[in-house]
Amino acid sequence: KEELPDAYAVICPCRPDSSYPFSQLAGVGVVFKLIHALCIEMGLGSAYLDYLDLVALGTVADVVPLVDENRVIVSFGIQKIMSTANVGRRKLMENCNYSNKPITSWTIGFVFAPRINAAGRIGDARIAVRLLTTYDEEEANNIVVLLNNENKLRQSTEVEILSEAVSIIDSDESYLKDKVLIVAGEKWHHGVIGIVASRITEKYHKPCILFSKEDMIAKGSGRSIEGFDLFKALCHCRELIDKFGGHELAAGLTVSVDNLPAFRKMINEYADSILNEEDMIPKLEIDAGIDREDLSIKNIMDLNSL
């Protein structure tokens, strides 16, 4: 909501009164800046650079734009990852067969981060923290094996829920007129429904909120499309929601199972006033037009050096 919490300090480059020149730092990037400031204040020199590998991991995993400071952080952080002496990160790279391979932002986003995140989605997030902080090689290796297994379980659970959700949507013609897809299933895994909501949003190019029902309570995770502020939509429907939080493109909420039909109706009435048919058509975003002769190894290397 557009209110700052009552706290001693709220450090966020997105604050309306912030003069910081770059507003798209990930949370881990903001913490990195705080550590940097503390190192200056306490005369600790460049000790803050010891955390660059972690900051790079978190920045890519948080899917913030890799531009400006984020690009610099990730570029230098990747160099630190490749030469890391950290037991946990080294074992993770070994297990993923990246001990002697170049590492890129793709490697972090699609190889390392899913395994680290699997701990919080499927099991206990503290396991991932332990991996990143342990000095014991055997413990690190055991944790990496566990995270691999949990990531495989996450993948299979995701496929199963996605299949069920798509079947519900495609077998019910009433979803054709809905601009916001509200889909609920019995005891769907809370740690995975956000990922599945993203998949459904991509498939149908419609905002989607996926709910897991249990004991007459529905816990949901939603994803949206450009032009539809999901948080504002939930504010509009707040009378039917027990609690919620989020931002323009993603949100989490809890609703009574009895209120789900009314919630679906209300949020779609709101969407009808915001979205038109053109908004529901996927748009191809073109970053730049280039000539064939510009597609050279030299130019690729030059771009990588930026």
Question: Residue spans of the language-model regions?
Answer:
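Short gly/pro/ser/thr-enriched loop/turn and capping motifs at secondary-structure boundaries
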Residues: 1-4, 17-19, 215-218, 228
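Short amphipathic alpha-helices in soluble, non-transmembrane regions
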Residues: 234-238, 264-271
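Cysteine-nucleophile active-site neighborhood
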Residues: 35-37, 259-262, 267
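Short alpha-helices
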Residues: 4-44, 48-60
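Hydrophobic helix-and-loop "lid/oligomerization" segment in the mid-to-C-terminal part
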Residues: 39-260
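Conserved strand-to-helix beginnings and helix N-cap segments that scaffold or border functional pockets
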Residues: 4, 125, 193-195, 264, ...
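A contiguous loop/helix-start segment that scaffolds small-molecule binding in enzyme catalytic cores
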Residues: 63, 86, 269-306
